[in-house]
Amino acid sequence: MGEGPNNRSRVRRLRPFIAVGAAAILGAGAAIGVTAANVANASPTLAAQLAARFPGYHIPATVSKALYDHSSTATPIKHLVVIFDENESFDHYFGTYPYAANTDGTPFVAKPGTPKVNGLYTKITPQGPVGPLLTDNPNEYNPVRLTQSEALTSDQNHADVPEQKADDGGKQDAFVQNTESSTPSNGCGAEYCPPGIVMDYFDGNTVTGLWNYAQNYAMSDNDYDTAFGPSTPGAINVTSGNTSGGYAADANDTSTPGVKTTDAGSVSALGSDGTGTIYGDIDPFYDECSDSNHTTTSPEGVLTGPNIGDLLNSAHVTWGWFQGGFAPSSTNSGGAVCGSESELTSNGQDVSEVQNYVPHHNPFQFNATTANPAHLPPTSLKEIGYTDQANHQYDMSYFADALDGTGGATLPSVSYLKPPAYENAHPGNSDPLEEQQFVVSTVNQIEQSRYWSSTAIILTYDDSDGWYDHATPPVINGSDDSAVGDTSVCTSVPITVGSAEDRCGFGDRLPFIVISPYTRENYVSSKMIDTTSVVKFIEDNWLHGKSIPGSFDAVSGSIDGPGGLLDFNIPPHYAPVILNPTTGAVVRGDNWYGNQGKLKQTATR
């Protein structure tokens, strides 16, 4: 047996937050300090300064709780928690599911009767999965299994056009030359990055927790990125399904805050009104922690169309976006500083300090209506999920308060969770083992809370990172933008969603797991869905099907209904399946596994 989970030191030194709560606000050439008094109840001076600095934004007034509706849903799901991780393709995590090699890492043996997936194999033999995609792949390299000691890999190229080129007209045969971006000649440090790395995959000995959730709940093998491209479009799509109506704001022009500028690498296809499509990574304008805590002056993104938060606010449904590192660690002349860091470790060694908060991963900070530029805390814990000065944007620590009922807090109807960067699975600053710590710890906490019986947890990803996936994306919305360089994958298909260019999709396949008492156990759904299906479920469950103009929600598949991941026509299974956050092994709640450690050591193939 190779390196096991107990041999991997998991030293994590989370730098303490400095409880400033809000920032010093720069206005009229002077910084205004935020005191304890106006953090608890934002002062008129603070409100005026923020309004001047961020046109269109105002600190929301606290809305009476009597207006909120907590009971009206179309399904038994009263609470949705979306864990939105980073940069993994389906084949990269589940290409050989449910077969694990069991030569290293946490042992894994699938339950009898586990369904096969649309993966890298044609059949599974006693010696393992076999098929031409594994041994005679049309790409320059065959896929190779990654061991647990190789969990920390390099980051691949996951920009819009390189992903299109990798798909090569649907042949899926040009990944190495288009999305592989790190090889030993470039220097990889502690990251594992041999030639052909973009083709490689993990199995249940490393992504053990996710495989065990698939064993006990439901997983899709037919979920796609709403559009080709990186994290920011993915984040916008999971919260609105519409990346158009955006523009780049000049962060260097303090005399006219928010004035439009150009950023061809992030915002394209500008119309006569100066707005276009956000198709690349760009930090949000309504965020004092953008541009490396305002130590640089790169353009920042603004969105003018509504998102799901706007719709939930109109319907008086509680919601929140919870992100690691959102609480400011200090202030500078530009306002809030999100400087907290955590130690990334690999194979028992400290690798690097990773900043926890990544602004361009927070989609609600692009809209004046849903932003919290100064990272203000809620006026009290009871206000979590309700409209007040925090405007539904919170540090991750507040999610634990909501689950536990600390200070009278309650769990919002809809919660999006973005882990701190070292635990978000993004190659280069995280890995599957760090991700597992966050996911399993969070799911365990939800499963053991008073909300579990009416909750659905979705685990999915913002983009594929450019990792190989053999499934040809079903492109239903095209784009023909010569300035960007769209390929025939997109130019051969008309625009069917809205009217903007550079929203070509669906993109490559992503993992999508639902954990809930209302899933079938050990179920694989092949019903086609995409990232915006999350938005569609929220609209259908809480908003009577109300949709967002120009959104993919009009064409996205449902995660419930016939063939879906949620099934309300079968008896719910309330007993939670509790996993070990470090190993991913089942520790309670699954009768088949029983004494899982003993079973799996003796039942390896």
Roles of regions detected by a PLM:
Residues 1-15, 213, 312, 417:
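Terminal targeting segments of Actinobacterial cell-envelope proteins
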Residues 2-3, 26, 301, 307:
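GH16 jelly-roll
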Residues 36-605:
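N-terminal pro-sequences and low-complexity stem/linker regions of secreted or lumenal proteins
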Residues 10-38:
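Secretory targeting and sorting signals
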Residues 8-9, 17, 80, 125:
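Residue-level detector of intrinsically disordered/flexible regions characterized by low predicted structural confidence
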